[in-house]
Amino acid sequence: MPTLFLFGASEGGLFDFDATLPLMAVQVVLLTFILNALFFKPVGRVVEEREDYVNTSRAEAKKKIAEVELLETELKDQLKEARLEAQKVILEAEQDSENLYKEALALATSEANASREKARREIDSQRDEALNQLKNEADNLGDLIIERLLAKK
């Protein structure tokens, strides 16, 4: 019956103190150096390069975001100024239009008044002429009537 105790273990086992255990330890250390030189250092270098690339990209992205925010602020200011300028131009155009309307209305009113006054003077002149003509005709008729009356006598 095999015993389960270490003291009673047969030779050639894992915990024998012959050259196997130190040889395995040397193999592990040697494998560690080889893996370190062939795998871990290149992978570590690639990881560091990638980390540097990511950090650089993030820094550039932050810089570009700051530039974009600055440009956005400037463009908003320019847009605000343009809107104010447009409102000012519109207001000036409305005022100019109102002034032109008032001037045109005043000119039309003055022309209408002048035309009305001219027509009134012409009517007065024609009325005076008609009255003078009627007076002359009345005088002529009166003279004619008097002559005929005197001629009958």
Swiss-Prot record:
Q: Show the InterPro entries listed in the entry.
A: ATP_synth_b, ATP_synth_B-like_membr_sf, ATP_synth_b/b'su_bac/chlpt, ATP_synthase_B_chain
Q: Does the keyword Transport apply?
A: yes
GO cellular component annotations of the record: plasma membrane-derived thylakoid membrane; proton-transporting ATP synthase complex
Membrane-related topology note: Single-pass membrane protein
UniProt GO MF annotations = proton-transporting ATP synthase activity, rotational mechanism; proton-transporting ATPase activity, rotational mechanism
Q: Does the keyword rRNA-binding apply?
A: no
Q: Where in the cell is it found?
A: Cellular thylakoid membrane
Q: List keywords of the entry alphabetically.
A: ATP synthesis, CF(0), Hydrogen ion transport, Ion transport, Membrane, Thylakoid, Transmembrane, Transmembrane helix, Transport
The protein's superkingdom reads Bacteria
Where exactly are the transmembrane stretches of this chain?
A: 20-40
As for what it does, the entry says: F(1)F(0) ATP synthase produces ATP from ADP in the presence of a proton or sodium gradient. F-type ATPases consist of two structural domains, F(1) containing the extramembraneous catalytic core and F(0) containing the membrane proton channel, linked together by a central stalk and a peripheral stalk. During catalysis, ATP synthesis in the catalytic domain of F(1) is coupled via a rotary mechanism of the central stalk subunits to proton translocation.
Q: Which PANTHER family match?
A: ATP SYNTHASE SUBUNIT B', CHLOROPLASTIC
What HAMAP family does the database record attribute to this sequence?
Answer: ATP_synth_b_bprime, ATP_synth_bprime
Q: Assembly and interactions?
A: F-type ATPases have 2 components, F(1) - the catalytic core - and F(0) - the membrane proton channel. F(1) has five subunits: alpha(3), beta(3), gamma(1), delta(1), epsilon(1). F(0) has four main subunits: a(1), b(1), b'(1) and c(10-14). The alpha and beta chains form an alternating ring which encloses part of the gamma chain. F(1) is attached to F(0) by a central stalk formed by the gamma and epsilon chains, while a peripheral stalk is formed by the delta, b and b' chains.
UniProt record similarity statement: Belongs to the ATPase B chain family.
Q: What is this protein called?
A: ATP synthase subunit b'
Species, as recorded: Prochlorococcus marinus (strain NATL2A)
Originating gene:
atpF2
